Amino acid sequence: MTEFDLSTREGRWKHFGSVDPVKGTKPTTKNEMTDLQSTHKNFLFEIEEVGIKNLTYPVLIDQYQTAGLFSFSTSLNKNEKGINMSRILESVEKHYDNGIELEFNTLHQLLRTLQDKMNQNAAGVDVSGKWFFDRYSPVTHIKAVGHADVTYGLAIENHTVTRKELTIQAKVTTLCPCSKEISEYSAHNQRGIVTVKAYLDKNNDVIDDYKNKILDAMEANASSILYPILKRPDEKRVTERAYENPRFVEDLIRLIAADLVEFDWIEGFDIECRNEESIHQHDAFARLKYRK
């Protein structure tokens, strides 16, 4: 049995089964290697979207840095075998050098870079992340950091924006109107999870505070907003406000829709409200879709 020098890393590797590289015959330099993706002939069909998913990369949302989860795609002509996926990461890295701010204008610039680098007509991106923001308790006005989940969706074809979407998911408090009506005192309440997917005006820039406008529609129409820090005067206010504003999921979803329909920069929306029922083992939910 061969003895290896266990005082060295290489010796220990071989002791545990590593072997020397084979003497290969294939090229080792890029210029000599076959580029299968660049093969040109009739491959029968165009592909609408091909790319990568689940890429985690640092992004900035307002003043906070967070982790963005990206999906990128481009189109592919029928006379091309494949795309060079490494160029997607090269495009991202080029923009990260300048700091990727999660806004539609920066995503548009990133897609234009991707479009040019891949030499394709269409490109798209979806990116999700935690949006952190300052939140003050309602009575004592103590500041803490709140958060919601956001997803940006953008697609372009040539120089035209074909898809422009923003999804926000936030948690609220809902107090049951039926429980309040039938009980001598109190009422059951729970966390509600509200998701709004807004289809934005593709031909114009969004307003400056568009995220806050949508979040306000989601939270203000609930029984109560959630707060990171509550002192006793705050807790009293939150409890009483919830009792004064009971909401079924049906109520909440309609009230949110009534606010969103007034925004001329929103072309349509999907809303889902889901209550994690505190007196049941199941959840309650409602969904609504609206297009102008």
Curated annotation (Swiss-Prot):
Pfam families: GCHY-1. Its EC number is 3.5.4.16. The record marks 176 as: May be catalytically important. Coiled coil: none annotated. GO terms for molecular function: GTP cyclohydrolase I activity. Gene3D superfamilies: Urate Oxidase. Keywords: Hydrolase. Signal peptide: none annotated. The keyword Hydrolase applies. Pathway: Cofactor biosynthesis; 7,8-dihydroneopterin triphosphate biosynthesis; 7,8-dihydroneopterin triphosphate from GTP: step 1/1. It catalyses: GTP + H2O = 7,8-dihydroneopterin 3'-triphosphate + formate + H(+). HAMAP family: GTP_cyclohydrol_B. Converts GTP to 7,8-dihydroneopterin triphosphate. Belongs to the GTP cyclohydrolase IV family. This is GTP cyclohydrolase FolE2.
